[in-house]
Swiss-Prot record:
Keywords: Antibiotic resistance, Hydrolase, Secreted, Signal. It catalyses: a beta-lactam + H2O = a substituted beta-amino acid. GO terms for biological process: beta-lactam antibiotic catabolic process; response to antibiotic. Changing residue 171 to A: Abolishes hydrolysis of benzyl penicillin, cephalothin and cefotaxime; reduces catalytic efficiency about 25-fold with respect to cephaloridine, about 10-fold with respect to ceftazidime, and about 30-fold with respect to caztreonam. Its EC number is 3.5.2.6. It comes from the Bacteria. It comes from Pseudomonas aeruginosa. This is Extended-spectrum beta-lactamase PER-1. GO terms for molecular function: beta-lactamase activity. Induction: Expression is up-regulated by an upstream promoter, active in P.aeruginosa, but probably not in E.coli. InterPro entries: Beta-lactam/transpept-like (IPR012338), Beta-lactam_cat (IPR045155), Beta-lactam_class-A (IPR000871), Beta-lactam_class-A_AS (IPR023650). Extended-spectrum beta-lactamase (ESBL) which confers resistance to penicillins, as well as first-, second- and third-generation cephalosporins, but not the carbapenem, imipenem, in the JM109 strain of E.coli. Has cefotaxime-hydrolyzing activity.
Length: 308
């Protein structure tokens, strides 16, 4: 069966989630039902991908919807930059000149507070760290300039065989027009596929893979999302994406990542909350509850396999 969770406008203008069909993988229908119970009734369109270590395919909820990625695309961008480093086209130690007056203004950019002066130099490795771990928008756009812009990133994603993901704009372009964010989209299948490509360690050198893993584990944004309800100390390598709020609606509250189970195996989870009329706290709680549910589901499978 196929699962589509759709937000529909009621007479009171509230967006309510309804279920018309279901798409599942070989995973237990129980996990699907548990996730449904989390998202039903929420004033949002919610997409979910869960790919357990024993699954040949991911469980997908709302698989045909296009979700704005927002800063989630910084994962894809980091993979492209590191890929070019592996090819010898870029060097992690090469520096980029940053002119304070010429970069995107009035945006989330902690790197601009870390440096003094009207102009300064930043190594590519530090731009990557700020872009991934801190979701820095200025660092992101400087990296885009190095690799050839959004079109180059789109082509790289397609070259990996990920067809249900598109990138057409950088941070500055999204800031100029909030509707542009919807053109940087992914399906939940695309979200699952980028995580799988990274988890399989087939796209990057060992050194680059280790660096990106470290930066994702050190992510400072979205602590109440995938990580929010997991046991303390659980290793989660993830990347968030967040839009602004306009007319009471949040276009994107996202998180996708790799959660390490107690036995060290990877659990891949992506949760995207689109066009939500819920509070930011509720949007993040949806993500946390889905991650917790998927994690506990895998723990029960492990427990069932353990000798008494």
């Amino acid at each position: 069966m196929n699962v589509i969770i759709k937000a529909v406008v009621t007479a009171s203008t509230l967006l309510m989630v309804s279920f018309s069909s279901f798409e599942t993988s070989a995973q237990s229908p129980l996990l699907k039902e548990q996730i449904e119970s989390i998202v039903i009734g929420k004033k949002a369109t919610v997409g979910v991908a869960v790919w357990g270590p024993d699954d040949l395919e991911p469980l997908l909820i709302n698989p045909f919807e296009k979700f704005p990625m927002q800063s989630v695309f910084k994962l894809h961008l980091a993979m492209l930059v590191l890929h070019q480093v592996d090819q010898g086209k870029l060097d992690l130690n090469q520096t980029v000149i940053v002119n304070r007056a010429k970069v995107l203004q009035n945006t989330w950019a902690p790197i601009m507070k870390a440096y003094q002066g009207d102009e300064f130099s930043v190594p590519v490795q530090q731009l990557l760290q700020y872009s991934v771990s801190h979701s820095d928008n200025v660092a992101c756009d400087l990296l885009f300039e190095l690799v050839g812009g959004p079109a180059a990133l789109h082509d790289y994603i397609q070259s990996m065989g990920i067809k249900e993901t598109a990138v057409v704009a950088n941070e500055a372009q999204m800031h100029a027009d909030d509707q542009v964010q919807y053109q940087n989209w992914t399906s939940m299948k695309g979200a699952a596929e980028i995580l799988k490509k990274f988890e399989q360690k087939t796209q990057l050198s060992e050194t680059s893979q280790a660096l990106l893993w470290k930066w994702m584990v050190e992510t400072t944004t979205g602590p109440e999302r995938l990580k929010g309800l997991l046991p303390a100390g659980t290793v989660v390598a993830h990347k968030t994406g967040t839009s602004g709020i306009k007319a009471g609606k949040t276009a994107a509250t996202n998180d996708l990542g790799i959660i390490l189970l107690p036995d060290g195996r990877p659990l891949l989870v992506a949760v995207f909350v689109k066009d939500s009329a819920e509070s930011s706290r509720t949007n993040e709680a949806i993500i946390a509850q889905v991650a917790q549910t998927a994690y506990q589901f895998e723990l029960k499978k492990l427990s069932a396999l353990s000798p008494n």
